[in-house]
């Protein structure tokens, strides 16, 4: 099962956002276990914690460093502990892994041999370090973006408090993986830090740490960190509570306290959305995050650009860049797939050159054959107009990137029809919306678009990515 599906299932089943740190810390071990051999005592304590909490938490988080500090017996203890956790409860290995050279083999070890569901990573070696962990489709990572350690403040707040490094980490890490692959780890007692992170990453799961230290305010943490559904946060069980002989009773009380605040928060957000829709966007566009990512990787640029049609626009949309960002490309393919899977056809056809990678990826996803009409016919070789195998009379869905005038995509469709193929549907990622779909229909084609330019501009403007002047320039077209 995919990690976040497994996590949400446990959140719902146990009505809990709580996770437990399964850390064999001799300094925190209750006195009732101290008369035994230290490893045996820690093992008995960890078994007690699991038995007392399994019905009241959504995840377990063993910290690798504590087990490593105990040497070989500690790693053996880790194996026993992982095996003792009920299989339906997700395991987040707190490793803070940061070594690029060992990332591939370590990912294989923790995910395939140890069987953990997610892992914490340090961000500073970048996407190359994170990528080996993301190739496991049912697993996830949590990126450390902030810690509560006072000594880290000089780094985290650099260069200014208005534009701190920890927010840049959040912004950059969003491009490394989808919300279904990548969450954030935030250690802080400062609700303002969490609020700023939530504002930048409204769609991400956040695992908070250190909130029970002096100065922490649980209600405020929940208020700024929860999403509109009362989820989106993972809350740690206090370490000192794990030493209690009445752990089960105490954790149920904490769960009830958190759920009470969750209920209030959800009601408050719902009421605000009715009266202040321009301020609190409770119901976001389904592709809200993708639109922002397209802007952030410069697929949308401003200036005076001459389009292929000859028209001059105050912006340019360059979707070719998506192939260099696997996470964004994957989301774009999903958008196309949601449309194409409902159509009747025999083959896909990409229009050269911009949509060929998209059509290829889509064909692989849908397990269907692909062809494409050549932009120009070679003067040598087979001189084919259509590349790829096909049979006369087959139905082809045409895939292109953007509809501006419709001229190039209809030229491609006409080439396909001249070879004896039938074309009824044209699917694009962005519709420029100047009556081009009507033009397609007048020529016998049904037009479909994942997004319209007005949807994109609306999301970018509401999110503060573009200013009023840019918004007007886009909407005036």
Swiss-Prot record:
Name of protein: Bifunctional enzyme PyrF/PyrE
Q: Which cofactor does it need?
A: Mg(2+)
Write the gene name: pyrFE
Family named by the database record = In the N-terminal section; belongs to the OMP decarboxylase family. Type 2 subfamily. In the C-terminal section; belongs to the purine/pyrimidine phosphoribosyltransferase family.
Q: Where is this region: OMP decarboxylase?
A: 1-273
- Please cite one Gene Ontology biological process associated with this protein: 'de novo' UMP biosynthetic process
Which residue ranges does the record annotate as region Orotate phosphoribosyltransferase?
A: 274-477
Recorded GO terms, molecular function?
A: magnesium ion binding; orotate phosphoribosyltransferase activity; orotidine-5'-phosphate decarboxylase activity
Could you name the domain of life of the organism this protein comes from? Bacteria
